[in-house]
Protein backbone atom coordinates (compact mmCIF):
# COMPACT_ATOMS: atom_id res chain seq x y z
CA UNK A 1 0.00 0.00 0.00
CA UNK A 2 2.73 2.51 0.90
CA UNK A 3 4.58 1.88 -2.37
CA UNK A 4 1.41 2.31 -4.39
CA UNK A 5 0.64 5.59 -2.64
CA UNK A 6 4.17 6.92 -3.12
CA UNK A 7 4.32 5.96 -6.76
CA UNK A 8 0.96 7.59 -7.44
CA UNK A 9 2.15 10.98 -6.17
CA UNK A 10 4.61 12.96 -8.26
CA UNK A 11 7.94 13.00 -6.44
CA UNK A 12 8.31 16.77 -6.43
CA UNK A 13 5.43 16.87 -3.95
CA UNK A 14 7.44 14.69 -1.59
CA UNK A 15 10.23 17.23 -1.46
CA UNK A 16 7.78 20.06 -0.93
CA UNK A 17 5.95 18.21 1.78
CA UNK A 18 9.18 17.85 3.70
CA UNK A 19 10.18 21.49 3.32
CA UNK A 20 6.92 23.11 4.31
CA UNK A 21 7.14 26.06 6.68
CA UNK A 22 6.64 29.79 6.34
CA UNK A 23 9.40 30.66 8.80
CA UNK A 24 12.25 29.75 6.46
CA UNK A 25 10.40 29.87 3.13
CA UNK A 26 12.31 32.99 2.03
CA UNK A 27 15.70 31.47 2.87
CA UNK A 28 17.85 31.47 -0.30
CA UNK A 29 18.56 27.73 -0.18
CA UNK A 30 14.87 26.88 0.36
CA UNK A 31 13.89 29.20 -2.47
CA UNK A 32 16.40 27.54 -4.80
CA UNK A 33 14.92 24.11 -4.05
CA UNK A 34 11.35 25.40 -4.35
CA UNK A 35 12.06 27.07 -7.70
CA UNK A 36 13.61 23.86 -9.04
CA UNK A 37 10.62 21.82 -7.90
CA UNK A 38 8.15 24.33 -9.37
CA UNK A 39 10.05 24.29 -12.67
CA UNK A 40 9.91 20.49 -12.66
CA UNK A 41 6.09 20.52 -12.45
CA UNK A 42 5.93 21.71 -16.07
CA UNK A 43 8.90 19.85 -17.53
CA UNK A 44 8.72 16.53 -19.38
CA UNK A 45 10.65 14.13 -17.15
CA UNK A 46 11.51 10.44 -16.81
CA UNK A 47 12.12 9.48 -13.18
CA UNK A 48 13.60 6.28 -11.78
CA UNK A 49 12.56 5.68 -8.18
CA UNK A 50 13.97 3.34 -5.55
CA UNK A 51 12.00 2.92 -2.31
CA UNK A 52 13.10 1.09 0.84
CA UNK A 53 10.76 0.65 3.79
CA UNK A 54 11.51 -0.32 7.38
CA UNK A 55 9.23 -3.33 6.90
CA UNK A 56 11.38 -4.68 4.03
CA UNK A 57 14.82 -3.03 4.26
CA UNK A 58 16.55 -5.60 2.05
CA UNK A 59 13.90 -5.56 -0.67
CA UNK A 60 13.93 -2.18 -2.40
CA UNK A 61 11.13 -1.42 -4.83
CA UNK A 62 12.08 0.02 -8.21
CA UNK A 63 9.55 2.11 -10.12
CA UNK A 64 9.51 4.64 -12.92
CA UNK A 65 7.42 7.70 -13.72
CA UNK A 66 7.19 9.71 -16.91
CA UNK A 67 5.42 13.07 -17.13
CA UNK A 68 4.54 14.39 -20.58
CA UNK A 69 2.08 17.23 -21.03
CA UNK A 70 -1.13 16.39 -19.21
CA UNK A 71 -0.29 12.71 -18.60
CA UNK A 72 1.59 11.00 -15.78
CA UNK A 73 2.76 7.47 -16.60
CA UNK A 74 3.64 5.24 -13.65
CA UNK A 75 5.33 1.87 -13.76
CA UNK A 76 5.09 -0.50 -10.83
CA UNK A 77 5.73 -4.22 -10.82
CA UNK A 78 6.50 -4.09 -14.52
CA UNK A 79 3.22 -2.53 -15.66
CA UNK A 80 2.68 1.01 -16.95
CA UNK A 81 -0.45 3.00 -16.11
CA UNK A 82 -1.50 6.46 -17.31
CA UNK A 83 -3.21 9.12 -15.22
CA UNK A 84 -4.19 12.71 -15.88
CA UNK A 85 -1.64 15.32 -14.75
CA UNK A 86 -2.30 19.02 -14.15
CA UNK A 87 0.95 21.03 -13.97
CA UNK A 88 -0.80 24.19 -12.71
CA UNK A 89 -2.47 22.28 -9.88
CA UNK A 90 0.83 20.57 -9.04
CA UNK A 91 2.55 23.96 -8.81
CA UNK A 92 -0.28 25.36 -6.65
CA UNK A 93 -0.08 22.31 -4.36
CA UNK A 94 3.67 22.85 -4.07
CA UNK A 95 3.25 26.49 -3.08
CA UNK A 96 0.56 25.59 -0.52
CA UNK A 97 2.84 22.98 1.02
CA UNK A 98 5.12 25.84 2.07
CA UNK A 99 2.68 26.73 4.87
CA UNK A 100 3.06 23.51 6.89
CA UNK A 101 5.63 22.09 9.29
CA UNK A 102 9.07 23.32 10.23
CA UNK A 103 12.15 23.03 8.04
CA UNK A 104 15.62 24.28 7.25
CA UNK A 105 17.56 24.28 4.00
CA UNK A 106 21.30 24.45 3.41
CA UNK A 107 23.38 24.66 0.25
CA UNK A 108 25.97 21.93 0.80
CA UNK A 109 28.34 22.10 -2.20
CA UNK A 110 28.70 21.89 -5.96
CA UNK A 111 28.61 18.25 -7.08
CA UNK A 112 28.06 16.65 -10.48
CA UNK A 113 25.26 14.14 -11.10
CA UNK A 114 25.91 11.80 -14.02
CA UNK A 115 28.44 14.31 -15.34
CA UNK A 116 26.09 17.31 -15.07
CA UNK A 117 27.17 20.19 -12.81
CA UNK A 118 24.74 20.63 -9.91
CA UNK A 119 24.26 22.29 -6.55
CA UNK A 120 23.51 19.97 -3.63
CA UNK A 121 20.98 21.17 -1.04
CA UNK A 122 20.03 19.57 2.26
CA UNK A 123 16.44 19.98 3.44
CA UNK A 124 15.50 18.92 6.97
CA UNK A 125 11.96 18.98 8.30
CA UNK A 126 10.31 18.36 11.61
CA UNK A 127 6.76 17.15 12.20
CA UNK A 128 4.82 16.20 15.32
CA UNK A 129 5.77 12.52 14.90
CA UNK A 130 9.16 12.74 13.20
CA UNK A 131 10.41 14.43 10.09
CA UNK A 132 12.72 13.89 7.17
CA UNK A 133 16.20 14.54 5.91
CA UNK A 134 16.55 15.13 2.18
CA UNK A 135 19.20 15.94 -0.35
CA UNK A 136 18.31 17.59 -3.64
CA UNK A 137 20.77 18.05 -6.51
CA UNK A 138 19.73 20.95 -8.77
CA UNK A 139 21.28 21.31 -12.23
CA UNK A 140 23.27 24.53 -12.59
CA UNK A 141 22.47 24.57 -16.33
CA UNK A 142 18.71 23.95 -16.32
CA UNK A 143 17.67 24.70 -12.73
CA UNK A 144 15.84 21.34 -12.57
CA UNK A 145 16.27 18.63 -9.90
CA UNK A 146 18.53 15.82 -11.13
CA UNK A 147 18.51 13.62 -8.05
CA UNK A 148 16.67 13.51 -4.72
CA UNK A 149 17.15 11.33 -1.67
CA UNK A 150 14.73 11.36 1.26
CA UNK A 151 14.91 9.59 4.62
CA UNK A 152 11.60 9.81 6.51
CA UNK A 153 11.65 9.36 10.27
CA UNK A 154 8.91 8.56 12.75
CA UNK A 155 9.71 8.90 16.45
CA UNK A 156 13.43 8.69 15.70
CA UNK A 157 13.16 5.53 13.59
CA UNK A 158 13.75 5.37 9.84
CA UNK A 159 10.43 4.46 8.21
CA UNK A 160 11.23 5.01 4.56
CA UNK A 161 14.09 5.90 2.25
CA UNK A 162 13.73 6.77 -1.38
CA UNK A 163 15.88 8.02 -4.20
CA UNK A 164 14.70 9.66 -7.41
CA UNK A 165 16.84 10.25 -10.48
CA UNK A 166 15.36 12.56 -13.10
CA UNK A 167 16.18 12.69 -16.81
CA UNK A 168 14.80 15.46 -19.02
CA UNK A 169 16.26 14.38 -22.39
CA UNK A 170 14.33 12.43 -25.02
CA UNK A 171 11.33 11.87 -22.73
CA UNK A 172 8.79 9.64 -24.46
CA UNK A 173 5.59 7.91 -23.44
CA UNK A 174 6.09 4.23 -22.65
CA UNK A 175 4.72 1.48 -24.85
CA UNK A 176 2.11 -0.92 -23.44
CA UNK A 177 0.21 1.49 -21.18
CA UNK A 178 -3.00 0.48 -19.43
CA UNK A 179 -5.52 3.23 -18.77
Q: What do these predicted regions represent?
A:
Residues 29-31, 104-106, 146:
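Sequence contexts marking disulfide-bonded cysteines in secreted/extracellular proteins
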Residues 48-98:
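An acidic-aromatic
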Residues 56-57, 101, 127-130:
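Short loop/turn motifs at secondary-structure junctions and domain boundaries
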Residues 105-120:
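Short Gly/Thr-rich strand-loop-strand
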Residues 2-55, 173-179:
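N-terminal leader/targeting segments and the immediate start of mature chains
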Residues 117-179:
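Gly/Pro-enriched, hydrophobic low-complexity segments
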Residues 96-108, 165:
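A short, amphipathic edge element
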Residues 38-45, 114-116, 141, 159:
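Edge/loop elements at the starts and ends of beta-strands within beta-rich repeat scaffolds
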Amino acid sequence: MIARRLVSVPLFATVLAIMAAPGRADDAACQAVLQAVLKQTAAPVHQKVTIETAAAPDKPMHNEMIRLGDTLYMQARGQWMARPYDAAKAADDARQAMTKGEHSCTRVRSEAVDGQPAELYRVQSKTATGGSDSQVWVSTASGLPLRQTVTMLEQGTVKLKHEVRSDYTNVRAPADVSR
